[in-house]
């Protein structure tokens, strides 16, 4: 068992202390820990190397987004033939001690498994955020399984199909190397899991989740990151359209677009009195138009 774990970061000073703490729970299960830096300040990069002195550090020198940073780490891992599992794990994700070993065993328990993941719980709780996602490849619609339910209500030990959230997942090297391929860097951020789900479906391999491993997405965010939240709305609007055009029929893509715009208008009508709600919808609409025009380059605001 030789697992390479990849974590990306960019000026995450506010996450560094808890990240180091979460890392202690799984570091002994790793063959290599790869930290990909998305163009941080020299001071933060110094802190990063001090915090993780034994890790492999890849400094992109620019912001490649989620997809670009993960791909840099994946490419590095694929160069080592000794590695037999690649783990993507967010720097604000906590996973139970021994969880990576259990995921590895689960990954190799079925030849058809390409990628696996744990049940993800809400911050420091036993409430489920998702137990994988159900997924309809014809419409691109995905829904979290067991969301908001107590983890004790999960009856299944494993579920095949659907897709695994991208912030905590393990795959065989050939999954990225020859079967499905690397992440689509045009996305930058948001939608990478859905894109992979479409491609996995076409490749005929499986994504699966197990309730025998628990992880917690702690959502450690910068409280002052208003621009980040707005531009997240932009990227979500843009990438929805991009992925619909990439994977769906024109009829399905148009229907999905109409439904999302209707939902946003209803949301806006309800929360029009809130300035941030108006701004977020505005950025979502801007992103939608960018997706329709094929403008996938406007990531500079990150």
Go through each PLM region and give its residues.
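Glycine-rich, basic loop-to-helix element that forms the pyrophosphate-binding segment
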Residues: 60-78
């Amino acid at each position: 068992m030789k697992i390479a774990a990849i974590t990306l970061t960019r000026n995450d000073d506010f996450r560094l202390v808890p990240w180091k703490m979460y890392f202690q729970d799984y570091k002994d299960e790793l063959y290599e820990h790869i930290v990909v830096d998305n163009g941080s300040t020299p001071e933060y990069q110094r802190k990063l190397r001090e915090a993780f002195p034994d890790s492999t550090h890849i400094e992109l020198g620019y912001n490649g987004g989620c997809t670009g940073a993960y791909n840099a780490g994946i490419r590095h891992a694929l160069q080592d033939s000794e590695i037999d599992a690649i783990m993507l794990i967010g720097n604000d994700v906590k996973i139970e001690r021994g969880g990576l070993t259990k995921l590895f065993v689960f990954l190799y328990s079925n030849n058809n498994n390409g990628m696996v993941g744990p049940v993800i719980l809400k911050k420091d709780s036993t409430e489920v955020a998702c137990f994988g996602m159900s997924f309809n490849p014809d419409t691109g619609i995905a829904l979290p399984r067991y969301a908001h339910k107590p983890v004790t209500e999960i009856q299944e030990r494993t579920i095949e199909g659907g897709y695994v959230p991208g912030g905590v997942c393990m795959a065989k090297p050939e999954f990225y190397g020859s079967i499905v391929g690397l992440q689509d860097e045009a996305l930058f951020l948001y939608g990478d899991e859905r894109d992979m789900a479409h491609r996995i479906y076409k490749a005929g391999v499986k994504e699966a989740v197990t309730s025998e491993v628990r992880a917690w997405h702690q959502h450690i965010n910068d409280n002052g990151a208003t621009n980040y939240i707005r531009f997240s709305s932009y990227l979500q609007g843009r990438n929805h359209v991009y992925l619909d055009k990439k994977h769906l029929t024109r009829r399905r893509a148009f229907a999905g677009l109409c439904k999302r715009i209707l939902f946003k208008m209803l949301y806006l009508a309800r929360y029009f009195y809130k300035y941030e709600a108006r701004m977020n919808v505005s950025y979502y609409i801007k992103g939608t138009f960018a997706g329709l025009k094929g403008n996938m380059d406007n990531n500079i605001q990150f």
